[in-house]
Curated annotation (Swiss-Prot):
Family per similarity comment: Belongs to the frog skin active peptide (FSAP) family. Tryptophillin subfamily.
Keywords, in A-Z order: Amidation, Amphibian defense peptide, Hydroxylation, Secreted
Subcellular compartments: Secreted
Keyword Secreted appears in the UniProt entry: yes
Main localisation: secreted
Residue numbers of 4-hydroxyproline PTMs: P3
GO term, biological process aspect, one: defense response
Protein known as: Tryptophyllin-T2-6
Coiled-coil region list: none
Amino acid sequence: KPPWRL
């Protein structure tokens, strides 16, 4: 889970 997608 990337920072821009959570």
